[in-house]
Amino acid sequence: RIDFMRAQKIQRDRGKSTSFVPAHMAFLGNPGTGKTEVANLLARILVEKNLLSVGKVIQVPAVSLVSVPPVIPSLFENARGSIIFIDEAYTLLSSPTAISSMVESMDRYKNEVVVIMAGYSEEMNELFHSNPGLMSRIRSQIDFPDYSDDELVQIFELMCLQREYQYDSEMLKLVKQFISIQDKDRYFGNARFVRNLVEEMMLNEGARTVRLCDSEGEDAINDKNLKFFTKDDFEEACVSIQQEIKRSKRLTLGFK
């Protein structure tokens, strides 16, 4: 797809006519499977190849386009040279007007804007089958499968490394056990779940460090216990995560 875009640009630069093949894409999968990260990577590649002039990734929730369809043309105008990333794009199903405006703008800015529509596979397929015009413009559909438990543990390791946090040899076993007992439904969160776990542990470690400093003075803090996750940090984070999961599922089911 990128090679074809490059060939078309060379043809246009040399005054040759080109046959339009849409570069727009659909990223299909559950939350936390890397769709946004891949969109950002794609933007950088397209800029490096001189296929996009700006290379921003403009993230737009589809619900905002459904509620105010007239904003779609101005969205594309402001996104010239960039990628428009539409999250939960299946929400467009509720507004044929928004879909029509989207298709029209995708054609008008076909050489200047790349659209990526993201969402759950089943709902996205329903969206595309509801409008053949939209389907014909989203020629590339890429599946983002859920991460395995081992991959999620590796993501935990990477996130800790990036944030310069350490832990003892038992921590990864505890993390894997906690991940393994989760209900891996579409609301699980994948890498987002791991990020939330790490951030909760960071909050707990920070609070523990301050308590130690207040009770024993700053001299009690050394390089070994600073930015070091303990079992207590992890267990307290697990409690917070489980409570948040319960709240989220109640809201999803329509309870208050």
Identify the residue ranges that each predicted region occupies.
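Pre-Walker A (pre-P-loop) alpha-helix and adjacent loop at the N terminus of AAA/AAA+ ATPase modules
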Residues: 1-23, 254-256
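Walker B catalytic acidic pair
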Residues: 87-89
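Walker A/P-loop
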Residues: 17-55, 138
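Loop/turn-to-beta-strand initiation segments
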Residues: 79-84, 110-118
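C-terminal engagement/docking regions of AAA+ P-loop ATPases
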Residues: 208-256
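Short glycine-rich substrate-engagement loop in P-loop NTPases that contacts/grips substrate
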Residues: 53-80
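A short helix-turn-beta junction within AAA+ P-loop NTPase domains corresponding to the substrate/partner-engaging
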Residues: 129-146
